[in-house]
Regions:
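Surface-exposed, charged secondary-structure patches
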Residues: 22-76, 155-219
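Short, small-residue-biased leader/transition segments that mark boundaries at the very start
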Residues: 2-7
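Juxtamembrane and targeting peptides
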Residues: 49-126, 130-164
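Extracytoplasmic/secreted proteins, especially bacterial periplasmic and envelope-associated proteins
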Residues: 13, 21-28, 107, 111-114, ...
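Post-signal-peptide N-terminal segment of Sec-exported extracytoplasmic proteins
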Residues: 9-15
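Short beta-strand edge/turn micro-motifs at domain boundaries
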Residues: 63-108, 201-209, 213-260
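Sec-exported extracytoplasmic/periplasmic mature domains
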Residues: 16-19, 120-124, 136, 140, ...
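Loop/turn elements at helix/coil->beta-strand transitions in domains of secreted/extracellular proteins
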Residues: 126-129, 187, 235-237
């Protein structure tokens, strides 16, 4: 009973340190498997436009099938020094890909990193309302899934017929996502090899190509995600295009900003 009271008290204390959205994310985080801090954190702080980003708290999250994910948890504090966002950080190569874009200012680079971290974390923590809010009502959405198959020989390349593509409206995509959230014990996304290009029109509109490893309790795949996102208002990103393909097409390469 004493330990339960201690935990409950600590959660109460945590609420006073967070904004409403920050506390909602915290509650989802502590329900994400069995979480624990795995090493002494070496925090790094970055101030941008009055907000402070704190990286990174190393944590592991274990699920019932012994599947474990290791994440660097990132905190964003608002101008009142309250935790406004919790996210799973990008790995160092992915961050470096964006930070090395020296033609962009620090604000742009930080907005892009924060967006990608919020995006991947929203799927892991099943933040349905947030995901619904960032997709444009008329977004172009193409999903893909790798079908189960038996290769004739070990190591044989997968045929194109083994991948199913589906074009969906936003409402169709969100309905399917809701089912996935309800039926999956866990979801985890890993990003790598990202390329970001700025559109020549529309202000802060970016095309993001990124390699995605998708893990869930019932399905997994690796492929290439493309997002065309409007970041003119960094607090309210709008995704206009979301596509997925399992590998680079030998004739056309990856879907990118030039296709739209």
């Amino acid at each position: 009973v004493g330990s339960e009271m201690c935990i409950r008290d600590s959660f109460t204390d945590m609420q006073s340190l967070c904004t409403e959205s920050g506390y909602e994310m915290f509650n989802r985080l502590i329900k994400y498997g069995q979480g624990k801090i795995i090493s002494e954190p070496e925090f790094r702080f970055l101030e941008c436009n009055g907000e402070v980003t704190c990286r990174s708290l190393p944590m592991s999250f274990k699920f019932s099938n012994q599947r474990t994910f290791v994440e660097d948890v990132v905190f964003t504090l608002n101008k009142e020094s309250k935790i406004d966002c919790l996210s799973f950080g990008l790995n160092k190569p992915a961050v470096d890909d964006i930070m090395n874009q020296t033609s962009w200012n620090d604000t742009v680079r930080n907005v892009l990193i924060n967006f990608l971290e919020s995006y991947k974390t929203a799927y892991a923590l099943k933040r349905y309302d947030y995901i619904n809010s960032i997709f444009s009502d008329d977004a172009l959405i193409i999903t893909g899934s790798v079908l189960k198959h038996t290769a004739a020989n070990e190591g044989q390349a997968m045929s194109k017929q083994a991948v199913k593509y589906t074009r969906q409206t936003k409402s169709e995509y969100m309905k399917k996502l809701q089912h996935i959230f309800r039926s999956s014990e866990f979801i985890n996304l890993r990003f790598a090899d990202n390329q970001v290009r700025k559109s020549g029109v529309g202000g802060e509109i970016y095309g993001i190509q990124i390699k995605q490893d998708y893990f869930s309790s019932s399905y997994g795949d690796t492929g290439y995600l493309f997002l065309m996102v409007d970041l003119n208002n960094p607090k309210e990103p709008v995704i206009h295009v979301r596509t997925w393909q399992p590998e680079k097409d030998p004739d056309f390469g990856l879907i990118d900003l030039s296709h739209f």
